[in-house]
Amino acid sequence: MSKIILKTSRFLLKSPVEEDDFDQITKIKSDPLVSNTQLYGKVESRELCRFMFQHYITDARITKTRRKRWVFGIYPLEVSSTFPSICYIGNVGLSKKNVKSDTANLFFEIGPLYWGMGIATECVGRVIEFGSENNIQNFIIDPIIGNEASKKVALKLGFEDSGTFVTAYNGLQQHIYKLSKQIRTG
């Protein structure tokens, strides 16, 4: 299994997540504050969560040359009053449509206890660096309409509003934000 560890000044980002993380993953994904802003909707049990998101672990079994998706669990580096334990607090994912694509979608979620602390911006930024190091030149963030926090993260990271809206598989509207190599280096 291929393990990847990234760091920011405050967080460790690990791919794959650990099996033991699924209790916390379920807690976050079943919180209406989170699930109401995500395409997957409400997750009502650990078993359903594990079934729906097993790729958080199994993608790491795919060889580097064939891999097209990475999900990084976010873990605080240090225990503090804000982070009383070193445990899973959210994730950032990177997904290409196919192995040869130079474009990837980013997705992310943070437990509501940790909103407003710049965690998503910091960790998504680090995953963009990882993607760039792995020949991804263009990035897309596509929050559902009404997910203002994800929109703010995209804009803080330099993404441009494409003015495009798409309808997802479940009928929800998504707003497309793009970040290209030209924007990052321009």
Curated annotation (Swiss-Prot):
GO molecular function annotation: acyltransferase activity, transferring groups other than amino-acyl groups
List the Gene3D superfamilies: 3.40.630.30
UniProt cross-references to Pfam families, sorted A to Z: Acetyltransf_3
Its annotated compartments are: Cytoplasm; Nucleus
Which InterPro entries does the record associate with it?
Acyl_CoA_acyltransferase, GNAT_dom, N-acetyltransferase
Q: What is its main location?
A: cytoplasm
- N-acetyltransferase domain residues: 12-184
| Annotated EC | 2.3.1.-
* Any one of the GO CC terms: nucleus
Q: Which UniProt keywords apply?
A: Acyltransferase, Cytoplasm, Nucleus, Transferase
Is Transferase a UniProt keyword of this protein? yes
> What family does this chain come from, according to its entry?
Belongs to the acetyltransferase family.
The name this protein carries in UniProt is Uncharacterized N-acetyltransferase C18E5.08
Species annotation: Schizosaccharomyces pombe (strain 972 / ATCC 24843) (Fission yeast)
